[in-house]
């Protein structure tokens, strides 16, 4: 009797483990049917979603130096330097900066700014070799932001991680459109043939 119980328990455990292995393999096979998600980075870029929070854009003329952005920031990051103008009886902004090496891109400063002098952009390329270059002042933050779809040297790609196979066309581009200019391989071949 004890022997039959052991065989029964062994069979139940074998069936249960086969069920768990089948569940795991079903996820694996689901991912195998998807297309590869490789982006040839400087020549192809993913288009950020509408709610993407990238580099913060700052408009110096709109700022009233109220320091609301500093108060709502979880890490008190924005540096606002101002002087009180006695003639006009109001604050004058002298300097504004944010260190994007420390910023967590929560966009609280943008949300609570009363004059809308701060806005988030689609820019996500903030890589530098020196961390001090990530400390953007009002001039660097005032640069006009660019969109990936407007860069002629880049093929914009929609985020396609969860799209069905075959649906990978870029935003704002006609079907079959290529990026402007030649690919680096073609330029290198042209240079080699002109040297010969």
Curated annotation (Swiss-Prot):
Any Pfam family the entry gives: Fer4_7
Domain 4Fe-4S ferredoxin-type: 54-83, 94-123
Binding residue positions for [4Fe-4S] cluster 1: 63, 66, 69, 113
UniProt keyword list: 4Fe-4S, Iron, Iron-sulfur, Membrane, Metal-binding, NAD, NADP, Plastoquinone, Quinone, Repeat, Thylakoid, Translocase
Membrane topology according to the record: Peripheral membrane protein
Example of a GO cellular component annotation carried by this entry: plasma membrane-derived thylakoid membrane
Any one GO MF annotation of this record: iron ion binding
Annotated region (Disordered), positions in chain: 174-196
GO biological process: photosynthesis, light reaction
Cofactor note: Binds 2 [4Fe-4S] clusters per subunit.
Predominant subcellular localization, coarse grouping: membrane
E.C. number(s) listed in UniProt: 7.1.1.-
Function field: NDH-1 shuttles electrons from an unknown electron donor, via FMN and iron-sulfur (Fe-S) centers, to quinones in the respiratory and/or the photosynthetic chain. The immediate electron acceptor for the enzyme in this species is believed to be plastoquinone. Couples the redox reaction to proton translocation, and thus conserves the redox energy in a proton gradient.
Subunit structure: NDH-1 is composed of at least 11 different subunits.
Family to which this protein belongs: Belongs to the complex I 23 kDa subunit family.
Name under which the protein is recorded: NAD(P)H-quinone oxidoreductase subunit I
Taxonomic lineage from the root: Bacteria, Bacillati, Cyanobacteriota, Cyanophyceae, Acaryochloridales
Gene symbol of the encoding locus: ndhI
